[in-house]
Design a protein with these regions (language model features):
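Short, glycine/small-residue-enriched coil/turn segments at secondary-structure junctions
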Residues: 2-4, 65-72
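Short, Lys/Arg- and Gly-enriched loop/turn segments at beta-strand edges
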Residues: 58-69, 86-88
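Residue-level detector of flexible, active-site-proximal loop/helix-junction positions
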Residues: 63, 83, 106
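Charged, alpha-helix-enriched surfaces in structured cytosolic catalytic cores
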Residues: 71, 85, 114
Length: 127
């Protein structure tokens, strides 16, 4: 699967898609393949603060529970409630199934993240 060129990525396998000062955050195709079938998503509430590099929730699969790490610091503006009843949407379309949306406190943080080519090189080294 191709990694969207307009997204930015973390070494913990999260992605962020920007729309102005709002970032939609999810997990990459590489992450969902490593996890297997996702059965539960634990996410923060609207209004909660998230910090770059810190955990903001977790995904549970048939194999393991994996922490989610925020790529940016900010405030949660939306939670994808569809994932509460259909967490497998992450397996089906990992780069469309956002988990939370965040009002980004410092847009410069996004520039420090990996672009698609750098992320693909990173996962090639990990494999």
């Amino acid at each position: 699967m191709a990694y969207p060129a307009n997204y930015r990525y973390t070494r913990e396998h999260e992605w962020i898609e920007l729309s102005g000062s709002i970032g939609a955050i999810g997990i990459t195709d590489y992450a969902q393949k490593s996890l297997g079938d996702i059965v539960y998503v634990d996410s923060p509430k609207v209004g909660d603060a998230v910090t770059a590099g810190a955990t903001f929730g977790s995904v549970e699969s048939v194999k393991a529970v994996s922490d989610l790490y925020s790529p940016v610091t900010g405030t949660v503006t939306a939670v994808n409630d569809e994932l509460k009843t259909a967490p497998d949407k992450i397996n089906e379309k990992p780069h469309e199934a956002w988990i939370i949306k965040v009002e980004i406190a410092d847009p410069a943080q996004v520039n420090a993240l990996l672009d698609a080519a750098a992320y693909e090189a990173f996962i090639a080294e990990e494999s």
